[in-house]
Amino acid sequence: MSISGVILAAGQGTRMKSSLPKVLHNVLGIPMIDYAQEAISHFDSKYVVVGHQSEKVSSTIFETFIPVVQKEQLGTAHAISTLLESSEFESDNSQYLVVIPGDVPLIRKNELDKLVNDVIKNKAAIGLISAKVKNPFGYGRIVKNNEEFEKIIEESDANETEKQINEINSGIY
């Protein structure tokens, strides 16, 4: 079984109001992207989708990681599409692809392994990590039908009923 991992690190992080790319901000003295790299370092192939200040972000990527440049930052789906259509990914034969944001310093290898193992065990087409929170404002919601996953709806697209859902998308697939 072959697994690839990709870190999404192309965004500007405009809400941080900083000229430094979001993934390069330190948590406990370590850039956030380093935590993400450590979390997927055991996978067979490792990629980082870079965009905003791509040279600066690429200069921090671990030696075994492959940068893929996203020229326009058009969201998560576009970043993943950029990877899948890239020459860097062309010869990748992995059966599974794990996607994580570059700004989640608390994610660990064992959590990603559990996600992959659950996908395999359940013969699922896709898996994701979600969380139940008291205040889901600003997050994509996990919409279910009879306890079965139906879709992810972003805050800006959610109706009033969907905005009451407290199960959110972590951005980890």
Short names for language-model regions:
Residues M1-S18:
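N-terminal nucleotide-binding beta1-loop-alpha1 segment
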Residues G5-I7, V48-V49, V98-V99, I126-I129:
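Structural beta-sheet core signal
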Residues G11, D103, K132:
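Active-site glycine-centered loops adjacent to acidic/histidine catalytic or metal-binding residues
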Residues L20-N26:
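Short glycine-enriched, charge-decorated loop/helix-capping segments at active-site entrances
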Residues L24, P67, I126-L128:
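Conserved beta-strand scaffold positions in the cores of enzyme catalytic domains, especially
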Residues I30-G102, L106-N117:
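Conserved N-terminal catalytic core of the sugar/cofactor nucleotidyltransferase
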Residues E63, I107-Y173:
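Conserved core of the sugar-phosphate nucleotidyltransferase
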